[in-house]
């Protein structure tokens, strides 16, 4: 007998890990948020490589969060490519500038705080995308 994970509140967070300073900042912020239990982490490169287990996990999550370092938005674009519309947070929108955000613990704390504010709804432009298929398992609500 299979067990459905519908409506279990599964949140998965993905990050940019680009070569730019803001990519490193996004990656480290996501690692910190994961440690704090904000969401489970997963691999955006596996999404880009179309690895089925990773794709199904992203599609089945109740909330998918994309943290990008710069306006290119690779994390968000990779998720959209597989049909997932994530809660998208771009560090550029939080005031971090590419080429001017060399990693430091204080910048990390600011990035983590900004991401938490957006996720909690403190920023008006936040559009939280919750899976509306009726479930979090990707079955379409038929279980």
Residue ranges and their predicted role:
Residues 1-140:
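Iron-sulfur-associated redox domains of electron-transfer enzymes in respiratory
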């Amino acid at each position: 007998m299979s067990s459905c994970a519908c409506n279990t509140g599964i949140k998965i967070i993905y990050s940019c890990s680009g070569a730019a300073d803001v990519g490193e900042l996004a990656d480290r912020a996501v690692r910190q948020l994961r440690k704090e239990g904000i969401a489970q982490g997963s691999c955006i490169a596996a999404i880009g490589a179309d690895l089925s287990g990773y794709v199904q996990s992203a599609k089945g999550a109740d909330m998918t969060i994309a943290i990008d370092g710069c306006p290119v938005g690779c994390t968000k674009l990779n998720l959209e490519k597989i049909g997932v519309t994530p809660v998208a947070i771009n560090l550029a929108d939080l005031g971090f500038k590419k080429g001017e955000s060399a990693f430091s613990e204080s910048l990390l704390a600011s990035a983590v705080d900004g991401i938490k504010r957006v996720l909690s709804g403190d920023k008006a432009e936040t559009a939280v995308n919750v899976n509306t298929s009726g479930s979090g398992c990707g079955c379409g609500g038929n279980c």
